[in-house]
C-alpha cells in the first residue's frame, strides 16, 4: 500500500487517486462505513466502489487473488510493518512487549488495535478518548525538555569525574536558561544523566542512565554491566569499557491535566447505530456500530463491533472486547 496523503487522498475520496491505500482496504472490507460523513465535513460519503476498483486493478489481478483476499493482504502487510516497528523499539532493545499496553492514535490507529495486539502479543490496548488529536493534546500537556550532549571518548579508567560533574553543571545551567525562556510555569524541574558506553572494539553504544552519586569508576562500571546484561543477556569479560558521550536532559514538569474531564457524563447511549457487514479473516461478520463518544463510563462492547467518532474509527475484532474507563479511554482486551 502507498500513502496518498490527504490530497488527493484514498481512491474512495474520488479526488483523482486510482491506487489503493490502507484506507481503501478498510472501506472495502466494511471496517469504515462508506455512508458515514468524513470528520469535519470533508466528505459526505466515501465511494467504496472506487476502493474496490483500485484494489482489483493494482493488487488482486497482478497477484491472482480475489478482491477480498487482496484487501486483506493489504492490511496484513500494513500490520506486519507496524508490528515490525514496535519490535524495533521493544524486543530489539531488550523489552518484552507483553509488559506494555498498546496505545493507537491518529485517525487510523484504532482500526488496527486488535491486529497489532495479536501481532505483537500485547494483552491490553488503550484507545484514548480523542485519538485523532492525541499529538495536539500532547503539545499542551507534555513536560518541556531540553537535551545536550558532549563527547568524552575515553576509557573508563581515564575519566576525570570531577571534570564530568563540572560539565554537567554547565549543561544544567544552559538547559535551565532555555526552559526559563519558554515563559511556561513548571511545578518541578528534573534532570536525566546518561552516558553512551561500549566495550573496546564494538561499534554500537549502550545508553546507561545514572545518578550523580554513581559518577565514579566503580559506580559506572556496575551500572554499565547491569545495563549490558539486561540488553544482551550476557556480559563480556576482558575488553576495556569506554565512555563515548555524556548526555544531559533537563525537564520542566508542567501541571498535570486531569484526563477525567474528557470522560462521558451521564447515562450515555448503549443502543447500536445499526449493523455493518465486515469481512474479516476470510468470512463476513455482522458488526454492531456504536457512537463511541455516547458510550457511558463502564460500558462494555463485545466484538465484532465498530465504534465511530468524528476523529477516528475503532474496529473491534471478533474475540475482543472494549470497556470505557473512568477517563473515557477504551480498554481493549481479548475475551475470556
What are these regions (language model features)?
Residues 3-13, 18-97, 104-336:
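C-terminal, non-catalytic interaction/recognition modules in large multi-subunit enzymes and RNPs
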